[in-house]
From Swiss-Prot:
It comes from the Eukaryota. The LIR motif (LC3-interacting region) is required for the interaction with the ATG8 family protein GABARAPL1. The C-terminal CBM20 domain is required for the interaction with glycogen and glycogen-associated proteins. This is Starch-binding domain-containing protein 1. Residues 30-70, 104-151 are annotated as: Disordered.
Length: 358
């Protein structure tokens, strides 16, 4: 058993050594890798060194030529670093001279931060030869010539932004608001004056022989006889009242209110038993206070099936009206009779009627 264990240990050691050798590669590969590294280091030093691989050295032993390849690139890198420092110093001198020549454009440097970085030269890139340095200098001068119009554009844009900010600030000031309000008031006053002139001309066009109280159907009911002056006064008051409701806040143009324009309270009352809770009784008529047959005035339920509501109507006026049944916001039933007529007179009154019966 001891011999078996020793054989297994020896075999395992050999297998492990072979596995490690396969992972690291053969001894010939190291020479190739060293040559590849030397070839990569050669361009960094500038020009290739002649005879670098002509010394006859094999891949197993690099020899003294490999040491020369290692030391020379370091020397070239130092020289390149010296060249890089020179390019940095020259760039700083050019920037300082440009700022001294153009001191007024220092403000425009902030606007260059918003320009894409691809439009500015990268002067900190390492130069590998004097030819590349001369090219970088030409590119720097060309890009600086391009930067000058970009700086002017940023300066103009800054002026536009400042002008817009000044206008916004002026709009927020209370003095500008006062000026705007005064201008609006003057325009509204001029519009009111022009409308007053038009209304005065329309009043002059009203025929003097028209009577505003003659309302009736088939001569069955006649309005009280009015003289000419009363007819004109009533006509003008009715016209002014109608226009005053259409135009908001313009009732001040009525200088004198005639005595016939006073109002009386009329209480409409009817008995009707509705079938549902959503139904109610309303009144409508040809006068604007009654909805002009387009809308209705709801009546309030009292008790025992009675509905009533008080409405103000102009005195000495004949109106045509009727009760209606309303359900869900719409008229579902009208009185089964002809239209009713009412003479308002000069005193308050109560109009009690039965549904569908005159």
């Amino acid at each position: 058993m001891g011999a078996v264990w020793s054989a297994l240990l020896v075999g395992g050691g050999l297998a492990g050594a072979l596995f490690v050798w396969l992972l690291r590669g053969g001894p010939g590969d190291t020479g190739k890798d060293g040559d590849a590294e030397q070839e990569k280091d050669a361009p960094l030093g500038g020009a290739a060194i002649p005879g670098g691989h002509q010394s006859g050295s094999s891949g197993l032993s690099p020899g003294p030529s490999g040491q020369e390849l290692v030391t020379k690139p370091e020397h070239l890198q130092e020289s390149n670093g010296h060249l890089i420092s020179k390019t940095k110093d020259l760039g700083k001198l050019q920037a300082a001279s440009w700022r001294l020549q153009n001191p007024s454009r220092e403000v425009c440097d902030n606007s260059r931060e918003h320009v894409p970085s691809g439009q500015f030269p990268d002067t900190e890139a390492p130069a590998t030869s004097e030819t590349s340095n001369s090219r970088s200098y030409s590119e720097v001068s060309r890009n600086e010539s391009l930067e000058s119009p970009m700086g002017e554009w940023g300066f103009q844009k800054g002026q536009e932004i400042s002008a817009k900010a000044a206008t916004c600030f002026a709009e927020k000031l209370p003095s500008s608001n006062l000026l705007k309000n005064r201008a609006k008031e003057e325009m509204s006053l001029s519009d009111l004056n022009s409308q007053d002139r038009v209304d005065h001309e329309e009043w002059e066009m009203v025929p003097r022989h028209s009577s505003w109280g003659d309302v009736g159907v088939g001569g069955s009911l006649k309005a009280p006889v009015l003289n000419l002056n009363q007819g004109m006064d009533n006509g003008r008051s009715t016209l002014v009242e109608a226009r005053g409701q259409q135009v908001h806040g313009k009732m001040e143009r009525v200088a004198v209110m005639p005595a016939g324009s006073q109002q009386v309270s009329v209480r409409f009352q009817v008995h009707y038993v509705t079938s549902t809770d959503v139904q109610f009784i309303a009144v409508t008529g040809d006068h604007e206070c009654l909805g002009r047959w387009n809308t209705y005035i709801p009546l309030h339920y009292n008790k025992d099936g009675f509905w009533s509501h008080s409405i103000f109507l102009p005195a000495d006026t004949v109106v045509e009206w009727k009760f209606v049944l309303v359900e869900n916001g719409g008229v579902t039933r009208w009185e089964e009779c002809s239209n009713r007529f009412l003479e308002t007179g000069h005193e308050d009154k109560v109009v009690h009627a039965w549904w569908g019966i005159h």
